[in-house]
Every structure is written in structure tokens, then in C-alpha cells.
């Protein structure tokens, strides 16, 4: 509570807590899912008590050879438990932002999925497991390439028939190109800024379902 008050006094209005779930033969276990959900809910309740907005981030990692259906199943279990705990802790869901993973196959899975399948399964998972009171959903990129992250977000928004406002909260999906330019020449501030601005623009369009591969090509031509 003391730290939250300090952050508020410094001007913070949003906070984030991340719980990580790795898919394997015996994990995540039901106990780890429950323990992480409890921690996320306790955090969210304390943050709202401190008059800030909690960003709740339960991330099912891409690491592994699992297929898209396994990701769907684990994400379903994770989201269900998270919202059970959030309700137990009397968190006002309207005052939260969910930062989830998309439903995608593991990075080592031999069976790849296209953007249509990813979007359909992701939106279906959200509809079935996220209460309608949650209006803000900001996806993490989770190891996807920049183009994949933009393309999949765009497709999700194109078929979004819910009240969810779906946007992005990317790390690598927003910064990778800029960091690459920085690695080439740290003094090239213009090139670094241009790379960052481009990805911000592309992801902004994806948040409206207005991104296209042609826009990517035009911008880099």
C-alpha cells in the first residue's frame, strides 16, 4: 500500500502485474493457475483501492511445440480462474484493462495457423471467458514478429462483434525495428524515430481493423 501511494503521488495512474504460464506436458498445473490468479486479483484490488487502474496480464507463453488448440485450452483455464479471483476480491471489472496473449500455436509447433484462425479462436476465447464488464483489452505481442503482431491484431478487430475495445500493448512488436536501427547506428536518431513511428502507425491501424500488407510495403518503399 505504501508503494502504491508513492506511485500515485508521483503521477502514476496505471499499473501492471504480469503472470507467466508455460505450456508443457505437466504444466501449468491447476495450482499454479490458481496461485497466479489469486496474486493478480489481490494486486488489482489494492491498485483500485489506491485509485489507479490495474492492467491484469496473464500471459500464456508461445514457447513450446503445443498446437493452437492447446493454447486455447490453457488460456481458457487461466482466464476463468483469473476472473473468478477478481470477483472474489470485489474488483470493479469496468476499471481494469486485460492484457492477454492471442490464441496462437507454440513457436516450435509444426502446424502453423493463419491470421483468420488466430483471430477467430482468440475472439471466441475472449467471448466465452472474459466478462462483458471488461471493456479494455490490450494484447501483448508475446514473441510474434512485428508483422505477425500487426496482422493478427488487425484481423481480430475486423471480426470483432463484441463491446471490447481491442488494442495493443506491445514490447518487441512495437520496438524491434527501432532497436535494430539503434544497433546499426546509435546516433541515427532520425532513422530510429522513423522506424518506431512506422510501427506505431501500423499498430494503430490494426486497432481499427484498417491495416494492410500494402500499407506496410508503401511505407517501406
PLM regions: where:
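Helix-rich catalytic cores of soluble enzyme domains
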Residues: 1-86
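Active-site capping/gating regions of soluble enzymes
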Residues: 66-221
